[in-house]
Amino acid sequence: MTDLTALRALPADRRRQAGKDLRDSAPRSGNAALPAMKGRGDPIDLLVTTSTQRIQSLLPVRWARMVASPFTFLRGAATVMARDLGELPVSGIRVQASGDCHLMNFGIYASPEGRPVFDLNDFDETLSAPFEWDVKRLAASLVLAAQDSGHSPSAAKDMARAAVTAYRLRMAELADLDPLTAWSSRVDIAAMAQGITDEAAREKEMARLAEAAATPSGGDDFPRLANRDGGQARIRDVPPLIYHFDEETDRQGQAALRARTLFTRYRDTLPEERRFLVDRYQLADVAFKVVGVGSVGTFCAIGLFIDPDGHPLFLQVKEAMASVLAPYAGPSPYVNQGQRVVVGQRTLQTVSDGFLGWAADDAGRHFYIRQLKDRRLASAGTLMESDRLDFYATLCGATLARAHARSGDAALIAGYLGTSETFDDAVADFAAGYAEISAADHALLKQAVADGRLVVADLPAKGKGKGKKGD
């Protein structure tokens, strides 16, 4: 592992050279290597084994989402890919990694000022880890998503390469900036959209961004997520994905109490000035929420908070387990896994949620709390249309470079990546090969369902496809 602390004392040109020197022990072409299939083990066994701490009654929802396509399988199989990546050689350069860096964990969300921001938006698996792991998972997800959208294998591989190239070029730009400028930099999605070559697709994207910028970010979710029943604010039930804790779903009466207790305890982890804001609201209702693909089965609840004048605030409490990267990258320094997620998000995002905090329940389980965002801004589904997926690939690659540069050494990484396309081609080769592995793993999941080994739930149509964001 490279001694990053010692390197920080060196000027940028020396750090670039140190990165270049790493190619001797970790050639860039070696990033094309795939995990050995002999002795790899059954990926379905690994998924089942690592699901023992999840809510077992929700696992059929998880399997139903993962079985939809090889792409959705990859989204839910972060633990499988982490094991595979852990067996491959690395450069030794570590960053605060996303840990689950597939393309649906990027998107547009509203900043506190209401401006649309494109960034990473899921951090359940974040941990200090080799920078290549995030790049490779993103590239593999692009290959599978492109194929799922009807692109040829060669075109899908080109999209993965485009994302890696954007990562390399953006990292080189960041390496030339002073630390303060690099830290506060953000990806200008509007400027990048202007680079879309297809005129119709470019105009469509610019119109969508203009609409997002005009969308209010405050209580806009209220009519969709809640209503007033006899004057009482209440979260809408949308079974089987959002529902209240009742005698049938919570016979012990503990789930609702747990959620309310966690919202109370979480306040103490907020910055003191943020507590003044939270204290203006009172908790009016809580409901259970099934989330994402990879997170299905973890405890997650929505809290509807109301101020004295009826203005709403939606907070979400979500269970945090150890990162899937931990067995291969090392454990988190934080005792509470919720704190691990919060610190990772604050590190990786340019503009983080001001309501981020964490808590633990009496059973020693860990959780983090965040504001429930307006999904119309957060969803990446519209960017995944076939005529814009190449633009989205470039956008994700550049965004990931910015995120990694905040905790990693941009000059060191840029020195390792260099100015040629050697790294880009190697990761594109890896992505194409790993997409085939994921497709084979997906076939094993389908067989396990067909054999009755795994039971799948009957989901609403909107819960099955690639447009469901955030794991």
Each model region followed by its residue ranges:
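Conserved ATP-binding subdomain of kinase catalytic cores across diverse folds
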Residues: 8-98, 103-214, 262-458, 469-471
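Long, low-complexity segments enriched in small/aliphatic residues
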Residues: 187-261
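Intrinsically disordered, low-complexity regulatory segments
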Residues: 2-8
